[in-house]
Amino acid sequence: MNSSMLGLATTFSLTLLAFAAPAVSHAQGSATATGGLPFEVKPVGTFDSPWAMAFLPNGNVLVTQKEGAMILFDPATGTRRTMSGTPAVSSKGQGALMDIVPAPDFAASKLLYFSYAEAGPGADSRVVLATAALDQASGSLKATKVLFRGQYALTGGHYSGRIGLSPDGKYLFFTSGDRQLFDPAQDPKSTLGKVLRLNLDGTPAAGNPLAARGFHAAVWSYGHRNLLGMAFDRQGRLWEMEMGPRHGDEINLIKPGLNYGWPKASNGNHYDGRDIPDHAPGDGFEAPKVSWNPAISPGGLAYYDADLFPKWKDSLFITGLSGKSLDRIALDGENARKVDHWDMGERIRAVRTGPEGALWLLEDGPRGRLLMLTPKR
C-alpha cells in the first residue's frame, strides 16, 4: 500500500463523511444490540455543537463547544455562564475547542488543561495543548499558557487532541492525530499520529521509550490515525480509541514504544475501496483489542468503575457518531470484548462518569443535549 497515492482533497472530504454520515448498523462481534435501554435518560441541558465536558468538585460541569466557547453549567439549576479569556479557535472541518481536564489539584490550583485547533498562516492549522486557571467568580480563564503546539497541516481534520493525566498526576498524555497525511504516523521525527507523554509544563517527559531511537522526545507510541478517546483503568493501563478509515474503528491498549500500524495496517479500508492489510500476527504492529466493521465513528471514551452501575464496573464506554450509539466494552486484564450496544437515536460526541457514578453523554450538533444516565427503576 502506498498511502501517499490518495489525493488530499478527496481524503479530506471523505473523512468528514464519518462525522456527518447517517447511522450505520451496530458493531459486529459479541456485543448485543439491547432492545430497550437499561437506564433512565434525563436531558439536563442543550449546547451548541458541544465537544467535551469535565466535572468540577462542586458538581458544576464545563462544556466546550466547537466554535470556541467554554460553558460553566450547573446541572442542578440549569444556570450557565460563558467563560471569557478562551483562545481563538479554528473551527473549520473538525477543528474545535476540544478536550478539557481539571488538574489533579484543581480544588487548590484551579488549573485546567484543554486543547484546541489553532489557525496558522494561510489555511494551515494545528492542535494546541494549553493550561489556564479557572476563576468561577469572574467567569474567566486566567494565566493561559500554551504547553504544546503540533505541526501545521493544510487539512482541517484528524486533530485528535485528547488529554489524559497519569494516575500519579505527574504526566500529561496527549493524542496527536495524523492530520489526514498518513505517512507522518510512522515518521520518527513527526509528532503526528502519536501518543505523547509530557511533563506538566509541556516539556517531553524523561524516559520516553523512543527518544534513543531517534524519535521526537515526546513520543510514547506511534502508528495512530485519529485518536478520539483515552482513559486509564484501575490498574493504570492506558486505553485509547481511534476512528478508522472506511470501517476499522478500534480500541488499543497503549504500551510504551509500540507501533500500532497506521497507515500500514488497519482492519478497515481506504475510502475509495482500496484494501489496507489487516493486522496479523507477526506483522510487527500492535493489533487493536477491539475493532468495528461496520464502523460506528467513535466520538468519545470513558472508563467506568463507579458503584451506581455495579455490574458495569471495570468497563469502557464508547460513543458513536455515525452509529448514534453507546457501546460497553468489558475489560479483563489486558483483554477487552464488546458486550452491549445501545441505539441512542442521536449522534453521541462524548461520555464521562459523573461525581455520583451516573454516566453523562453529550449529543453532537447545534442543539446537542447533555444527558444523565441512571439505573432504570
Sequence positions of predicted segments:
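Conserved blade-ending motifs and adjacent loop-strand segments that build the rim/top face
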Residues: 335-355
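Blade/loop signatures of beta-propeller domains
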Residues: 26-40, 139-141, 203-212, 267-282
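Short loop/turn segments immediately following beta-strands, especially the blade-tip
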Residues: 75, 132-139, 196-205, 255-260, ...
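Acidic, Gly/Ser/Thr-rich repeat motifs that build Ca2+-stabilized beta-propeller blades
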Residues: 26-182, 229, 237-240, 244, ...
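Acidic/polar, solvent-exposed loop segments in beta-strand-rich repeat domains
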Residues: 181-190
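Repeat-solenoid scaffold signature
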Residues: 215-250, 255
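Bacterial N-terminal signal peptides
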Residues: 9-21
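Mobile, glycine-enriched helix-loop/loop "lid" segments at the mouths of ligand-binding/catalytic clefts
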Residues: 196, 249, 253-281
